[in-house]
């Protein structure tokens, strides 16, 4: 029977970051992930990292190993309406407003550091049951079919004083889970532009929904938010037709070239009211799933990770005790709910083509451009969160 102090469910970027933050804590840590190691490291999704996230990754000792693309300027505008603004890193005396990296590359750098620390990672091992008890959580670990460990004769029990769930979707229908279906899908792809990205990102609000372009390597990572019906139409047209549609949305500001294969996924808001329970804490997508309009998901998750690690380091003793987890939850309330509702408000205002809202949107963008303190507030929230370090 394994008896770690901390069982981390999920060896993606969030779970690996937590293990790395606690590597010198004296806690016995084990990670388990149902996926093969290669699948985690090959994840092609792109993540927008805020400047505050860079500071955390530097403290974890992995920043210099990451192949990141900096975002030095963010241009925000709307199609067919007035109002625009541009956020510039030099205005805040920062090297960049944010950075873009593939999820697989980030997981690879974090995993290499975790492996160097000697913390065990159980790949292709699914946690099929969690049973909280007075002094521990009993977890059932099962090797996934076809994995090297699948010949083990019995399911392996594990008794952990604390379980951190850092993978998987939230339980639909749970009384503690708030859900909102935005009736939107995101199309994601890579797209080339003449002249390269020059470390610029674009957020363009259109009648069909917002479009984000993030500089990544030598081209842009594209995220287009549309209705499910419109997503069907855009997936059915050929590459040339799709590029023509994008050109129409952006006008002459950018000249688009080739586009990669498009993928889609549904969008919604889902979060736990309480990120901590009986000897269990939920992180990342297991705690909240946000709309990508503000790029806050992973950045919020990493702030949660850092706060949890800090709480465990300050409260020595039982890591799964109620007082410890209450202290963690209290410390994250302002930033966590601020990010959730900030993102939800952006979706409601900027993903709606109702005429009065379109005018409000234009006025808001104009205000951001003309009122530096307001622009600074938005920029600093995106870079650092509500309670992150400056």
Task: Walk through the language-model features, giving the residues of each.
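Glycine-rich FAD pyrophosphate-binding loop
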Residues: 23-45
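N-terminal FAD cofactor-binding segment of flavoenzymes
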Residues: 43-79
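Conserved N-terminal helical subregion
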Residues: 2, 68-175, 180-188, 194, ...
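C-terminal helical "tail/cap" subdomain of flavin- and related membrane-associated enzymes
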Residues: 310-390
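Conserved FAD-binding catalytic core of PHBH/FMO-like flavoproteins
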Residues: 144-149, 153-157, 162-255, 259-262
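N-terminal Rossmann-like FAD-binding beta1-loop-alpha1 element of flavoenzymes
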Residues: 4-31
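FAD/FMN-dependent oxidoreductases across multiple families
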Residues: 233-320
